[in-house]
A protein has these predicted regions:
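Secreted/periplasmic proteins
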Residues: 2-114
Length: 114
């Protein structure tokens, strides 16, 4: 009987996780010319912050971004929009550095809402 309740609790904990993969696709990072400009949310863009642009997620959404080529991870906050693009996310330079893809320019990632 004790194992039954432990199993039920474990299933509840596992199924209650909101960190499911939201999206998979290509990531890039902002060019330096955007430093100091206003984002779509009204914030000033800074390359040294951990922020991102996404097509539709609400401003303030926090994401776990995983680089699929090297399994590195960064946590970012959405504060801007991507226009008509095949990319799923544009990252600040600091976020791209943490994911180790600056020299490549683009990388395949997964996005998880946190």
């Amino acid at each position: 009987m004790n194992h039954f309740f432990t199993g039920i609790m474990l299933i509840g904990l596992l199924s209650g996780s909101n960190n499911a993969i939201y999206q998979t696709g290509t990531a890039s990072f902002y060019a330096n010319k955007f430093e100091g400009r206003k984002t779509a949310s009204g914030e000033i863009f800074r390359q040294d912050s951990l922020t991102a642009a996404h097509k539709s997620l609400p401003f303030g959404t926090k994401l776990k971004v995983t680089n699929l080529s090297n399994d590195s991870v960064v946590f970012v906050r959405v504060n801007d929009r991507i226009g008509n693009s095949s990319r799923v996310i544009d990252l600040s330079l600091k976020a791209a550095q943490k994911l180790n893809f600056v020299n490549k320019g683009l990388t395949k990632v997964t996005l998880e809402k946190i």
